[in-house]
UniProtKB/Swiss-Prot annotation:
Entry keyword set: Cell inner membrane, Cell membrane, Membrane, Transmembrane, Transmembrane helix
Organism: Escherichia coli (strain K12)
Topology Cytoplasmic: residue spans: 27-44, 88-152
Family: Belongs to the UPF0266 family.
Periplasmic topological segments: 1-5, 66
Segments passing through the bilayer: 6-26, 45-65, 67-87
One family name in Pfam for this protein: DUF986
InterPro entries: DUF986
Phylogenetic classification of the source organism: Bacteria, Pseudomonadati, Pseudomonadota, Gammaproteobacteria, Enterobacterales
Protein name: UPF0266 membrane protein YobD
Gene Ontology cellular component annotations, sorted alphabetically: plasma membrane
Length: 152
């Protein structure tokens, strides 16, 4: 096993740990989930480039008769990338005292202002930054509003 294979195993383990945390652990942290809203995905061009480069590496490894374990590890990395970028649905998870957005816990007390843009993007102003929340279904904005009014 080469250092390349060890690095591939490390990246696969990191992506697998992220997927498990995102899917199973995060919804159970900080109390019961009051509301989970699916969000729009960001640009997919990055994911196409990532998976495309891995496919090129697989092709290069096969044509140069590289190690079989490297081919399998690259295939596993491509599958993990496909899951993370195309199958997994990003979501905002609301709890009693705060919410998870982009896998970061934000307490309701940190929200200084909220606005709704013309194109249906909920803008939350925190102390240092703005959160741009793009929901998949525009009707979910009303659910978020009702939840925030009831918890405040």
């Amino acid at each position: 096993m080469t250092i390349t294979d060890l690095v591939l195993i490390l990246f696969i383990a990191a992506l697998l740990a992220f997927a498990i945390y995102d899917q199973f652990i995060m919804p159970r942290r900080n109390g019961p989930t009051l509301l989970a809203i699916p969000l729009l995905r960001r640009g997919r061009i990055d994911s196409v480039i990532f998976v495309g480069l891995i496919v090129i590496l697989i092709y290069n490894n096969v044509t140069n008769h590289g190690a079989l374990i490297t081919t399998w590890l690259l295939s596993a990395l491509a599958l993990m990338g496909f899951y993370i970028f195309w199958i997994r649905v990003p979501k905002i998870i609301f709890k009693q005292k705060g919410f998870f957005f982009a896998n970061v816990w934000i307490e309701y007390s940190r929200i200084k202002a909220m606005n709704l843009s013309e194109d249906g993007v909920l803008v939350m102003q925190l102390e240092q930054r703005r959160l741009l929340i793009r929901v998949r279904n525009i009707d979910d904005l009303e659910k978020i509003y009702k939840l925030l009014v009831s918890t405040q």
